[in-house]
Curated annotation (Swiss-Prot):
GO terms for biological process: barbed-end actin filament capping. The keyword Isomerase does not apply. InterPro entries: Aim3. It is found in: Membrane raft. Residues 37-58, 390-399 have a biased composition (Basic and acidic residues). This is Altered inheritance of mitochondria protein 3-1. The keyword Ribosomal protein does not apply. The gene is AIM3-1. Keywords: Membrane. Residues 319-328, 356-371, 406-419, 458-473, 512-533, 541-552 have a biased composition (Polar residues). It comes from the Eukaryota. It is a peripheral membrane protein. Belongs to the AIM3 family. It comes from Candida glabrata (strain ATCC 2001 / BCRC 20586 / JCM 3761 / NBRC 0622 / NRRL Y-65 / CBS 138) (Yeast).
Length: 661
């Protein structure tokens, strides 16, 4: 452990070398631990691990000891990265200049750079920032100018106004003070920052634009009227606005000159509005001291509680260049419109770290609103959302589909077999489950003619007869396919039990004995076709076992042909008898099956003869049972007459052989 500790100690100093030592030390200590585990119990290991974990976690606690207020605030927007450094120097009373500057506007700390330089003018600045400069109408303002430079020139209040028309100082105050104050504030800063005349000139230009905008707003009586309501000195402010009109109309030079004569104008303002300034100073000082522990210009609750959050607004707006915050030609209040309550109140704070200074809000009136503004809450109306699905909803889709199926079945009862087949397919697709072999009542018409390649002659005839005899059965084809292993495209292993198909109160399946009579007619072609009846399959199995055990010689082909013909004749006769007894019109299906019989007999007979003569040599072993079948079939037929259908066969032994042939 000592080596580990030393390695950790050196890791920070030597970087790569230190990490190497740590790795080596860890490797060596792990070796020791491995050897100790063999001898000792795990107590020592746990003890050492605990020590190591303690040492390892202790440095993390050091981070908790640091005061986050010691760090400068991160830049809130991309354009302000340069300003952060200045903010740290100018931060007042431990407030980050970036944060305090909303209040910093009162502090004359320039909206971007809170500079101590502005502080001597803090009292006039506090008075002055009341004039919200309408968002600098960018007509004269150059976006390229650095805010870091310009705004330090402007007292914070003016900068807040200048950078953001958003910051809406109390309505009456703002317009008038704006017209004069931008000059005064610039003047105050200029006098203080006389070393920056050029920059001041640059700043003056935006003031002109702001003044022009402001004058426009003043021309709109709505803006000035609100100001009048708010302040007694409105008329003076209007006069000042008219004065500013001269300035604003004048070229930059005039304003610059005015800026260099800051004190007299500021004094004029103070004289013109002594009441307002005194109230602002007192209220602002109280609020600033309470909330921020600083004197920062906060718009007094008395004058306009609405705009108490202007400091907040300034905090939003000061942190970003004015162009970003507002499009030009949008005065903070909208041109000629009474300032909305807390225009910036609903903007989310971008990325300002939480600070006690910010949570403390300037006025009790806007405290709740300000908190809501600073903490963006995404309120989701859960009532608008649909209720979550429950287990009860699981079967609803299938239940609805069942009703659909019943409707389709009733409609299909009058439709021919081809349309019924398509409807049956549609029903199955709707349910997304394999169609049961037996359907609900009224589905007898669903019986689909068996696919020609899958059905032997006797089977197709028998299925037709059975379908008409039992009106409640969904489709005998499905039942036969079930026994064949071709049920609904599923493999033999996936077949659903046929008992499920009898659930809906349908009449029971017809006794299989009648079909066994028909199907058990020794039809030698059936074993060859890939799909075959169950009885024939059992016969084939029995013959396979008997033939393989005795290895009897194969019968001659002519005997087999005779048997084939005889068996076919018998099966035809039986099927015709059954159909005549049922007296059911089976014309279309009967015609098709009769044609299929002839086609199938030829193809099956040819393939069978080829295999007998050994043309398919590889298949001889598999086909032996088939060859020996015809003589044995009649015996098995008698034994199977009265018996119930045997269980479903799981394998089709002869199917693979015919794939090759």
């Amino acid at each position: 452990m000592d080596s580990l500790k030393s390695g950790l100690a050196t890791a920070g100093k030597f970087t790569y070398k230190g990490t190497k030592t740590v790795a080596k030390a860890g490797y060596n200590t792990s070796k020791k631990h491995m050897h100790k585990k063999d001898k000792d119990t795990h107590h020592t290991d746990h003890h050492e691990e605990d020590e190591y974990s303690e040492d390892y976690h202790t440095p993390r606690s050091v981070n908790t000891l640091r005061d986050p207020s010691s760090f400068p605030p991160p830049p809130t927007r991309s354009g302000q990265a340069g300003h952060v450094a200045g903010n740290t120097a100018g931060s007042i009373a431990g407030n980050y200049s970036g944060y305090s500057q909303p209040t910093a506007a009162a502090n004359n700390t320039i909206s971007y750079n809170a500079q101590a330089q502005n502080t001597p003018y803090s009292s006039p600045a506090q008075q002055q920032p009341v004039s919200p400069q309408p968002p600098v109408q960018n007509s004269q303002y150059n976006p390229t100018q650095n805010y870091a430079i310009q705004q330090p020139q402007q007292p914070a209040g003016t900068n807040a106004n200048y950078s953001y028309g958003n910051q809406q100082h109390p309505a009456g105050q703002a317009p008038i003070v704006n017209s004069i104050t931008p000059n005064h504030q610039y003047n105050a800063n200029n006098t203080f920052q006389s070393n920056l005349p050029n920059q001041q000139l640059n700043v003056a230009a935006p003031t002109q634009s702001t003044n022009n905008n402001f004058n426009q707003m003043a021309a709109n009586n709505t803006y000035t009227n609100s100001a009048q309501v708010a302040y007694n000195s409105q008329q003076q402010q209007l006069q000042q606005n008219s004065q500013q009109n001269t300035y604003s109309n004048a070229p930059y030079q005039v304003q610059a000159q005015a800026a260099y004569n800051p004190l007299p104008q500021q004094q004029q303002q103070q004289q013109q509005q002594p009441e307002y300034n005194t109230q602002l100073q007192q209220n602002q000082q109280l609020h600033n001291q309470q909330a921020y522990g600083q004197q920062q210009q906060i718009y007094s609750n008395n004058t306009q509680p609405q705009y108490v959050s202007q400091t907040q607004q300034t905090s939003y707006t000061q942190n970003a260049p004015p162009q970003q915050t507002r499009s030009p030609e949008q005065p903070v209040y909208g041109q000629g419109i009474t300032p909305p309550v807390q225009a910036n109140a609903y903007r989310p704070m971008p990325s300002i770290p939480p600070d006690v200074n910010q949570t403390a809000i300037t006025s009790t009136n806007s405290a709740n609103e300000a908190l809501q503004n600073r903490i963006p809450m995404n309120n989701v109306d859960l009532s608008s959302l649909p209720p979550p699905p429950t287990h009860r909803d699981r079967g609803r889709a299938s239940v609805e589909n069942e009703t659909i199926d019943e409707n389709m079945q009733t409609n299909n009862s009058t439709i021919d077999s081809s349309s019924v087949a398509s409807a049956d397919i549609n029903n199955n697709s709707i349910r997304n489950i394999p169609a049961p072999a037996v359907g609900p009542p009224g589905a007898a018409t669903r019986a689909v003619p068996p696919p020609p390649p899958r059905r032997t002659t006797s089977q197709s005839m028998s299925t037709n007869s059975v379908v008409e005899t039992s009106p409640g059965i969904n489709s005998i084809e499905q039942i036969n396919n079930y026994y064949d292993g071709t049920y609904a495209g599923h493999s033999a292993n996936e077949r659903p039990p046929i008992t499920n198909t009898l659930k809906r109160g349908t009449p029971p399946l017809p006794r299989r004995s009648t079909s066994t009579k028909m199907n058990t007619q020794p039809n030698p072609q059936t074993p060859i076709s890939p799909s075959r009846d169950t009885n024939m399959d059992l016969q084939r199995r029995s013959t396979v076992s008997s033939i393989q055990s005795s290895n009897r010689p194969m019968p001659d082909p002519p005997i087999r042909k005779d048997n084939i013909q005889e068996n076919n004749i018998e099966s035809k006769q039986v099927n015709q008898e059954v159909n005549s007894q049922m007296s059911v019109s089976n014309i279309g299906i009967g015609d098709i099956t009769s044609e299929l019989q002839h086609i199938k007999l030829k193809s099956v007979g040819n393939s069978y003869e080829r295999e007998i003569h050994g043309e398919a040599a590889t298949e001889v072993v598999h086909n032996k049972p088939l060859k020996k079948k015809p003589p044995t079939v009649p015996k098995k037929k008698d034994s199977l007459k009265g018996k119930a259908p045997p269980p479903v066969p799981k394998k089709k032994p002869t199917l693979t052989s015919f794939v090759h042939s």
